[in-house]
Amino acid sequence: MQYPKNILFIGNSATYVNDLPGMLVSLCREQGIAITEKQIVKGGRRLKTHAEEPAVYAEIAKGYDAVFFQENGNAITTEEERQKSLEGCKRMVEAAQKAGSQCWFYVRPPYGNDLAGLRSFDQCILFDRHFTPAAQQWNVQCAYINRAFAAAIKDHDIPLWGPDNAHTGVQGAYLAVCTFYASIFGRTATELNTAYGIPQEAAAVLQKIADQIALEGIIPWET
């Protein structure tokens, strides 16, 4: 399997808080996997807005091995917003595929607080139902960070969010990075070192969850 060596992330603070791409690069390096990352991110930015920016297409045209797209959760709470999200996604996906990139949806984690009346676990289902059909239709891969969070919520008592209860805390961030790793490389997250100062015992739990989602294909709300 040909692994991506340079990766572009397009999204918002769900990508840059705790620097998920940078931590992925660091943990990969420790495993002898050399990758680089570039981020086009801005707080609160929606994919439909990214899709209106010429600079985004100029960066996509450079031909990254992989491009990850990450949405604002608020952008898919109504049918109108969901349609706008998909329209923006499709434009950027088509541009990235034309440039020879493998496209991925970074299916984001839920918020720790309610979103449009949905609790965190149910947000995971909403995000899944938004992106999975489009991914299947457009030949896009998915990194199901939402499913990893759903599994953690369902089966464990793990502090996943930071003080604002919206962005990931260190354990949520590590869970996301482990899920990226297992999804992209098809390798077990248990081979990764811990990070963010997380104790090894806690890291092992998060690694196992990532493997269940990325390697075993578990969908928490169907089990």
Give the location of each predicted region.
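Conserved catalytic region of serine esterases and O-acyltransferases that act on ester linkages
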Residues: 167, 178-223
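Basic/polar N-terminal segments that are highly enriched at the extreme N-terminus
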Residues: 1-4, 223
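Alpha-helical cap/lid subdomain in secreted, periplasmic
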Residues: 58-170, 182, 189-193
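Conserved SGNH/GDSL esterase-like catalytic core that processes O-acyl groups on lipids
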Residues: 3-10, 14-91
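Generic helix-packing signal
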Residues: 32, 100, 139, 177-181, ...
